[in-house]
């Protein structure tokens, strides 16, 4: 498995059978600068969305039309995407699991909101925010937490799914900060690898993952604070 962080909460996940973009906020992502959308979207089979905010939906509509990738989203967000011309959609909701060929995706809880704001400034709710639990054939499992704060039922997610890898938001203000994220990982999960994300993109959120890295010091989890465009082979 090859995992590439594209900045913010966007990732490319490659296995022998699937090529996935997660929360592909690329065009207006300052951390994506210097990378090429055509390169990172080449050959993608699936686009997975944790929730409806613009910094996660990002380029989904254009990429889905260009590549023919299947888009997975919560039911309300899926309906909105359908109204924009996206026609290959797998919809679900919290607690549901969807089989996607060589892997499955389960919608887990997250403490956050999910909406799009129209030109008149009105916020339109698009279902609940979620994490996504990904189980692959013969590969490590991944929990993409999405945007969230810490919550005690993270323990149930770990009990049910035993994720090997965590994509962990650490930027504060809109999600939990690094110290709280470290507490969540140490108290509720047994990740073999944790990759911090959702930081360094906007001036008003934390610019580094240092608080998370410090909070994880001494844990059994291998923390990989990789740079945007950097890849890991796991």
From Swiss-Prot:
Keywords: Hydrolase. GO terms for molecular function: hydrolase activity. The keyword Cytoplasm does not apply. HAMAP family: UPF0173. Belongs to the UPF0173 family. NCBIfam families: PRK00685.1. This is UPF0173 metal-dependent hydrolase RL2074. It comes from Rhizobium johnstonii (strain DSM 114642 / LMG 32736 / 3841). The lineage of its organism: Bacteria, Pseudomonadati, Pseudomonadota, Alphaproteobacteria, Hyphomicrobiales.
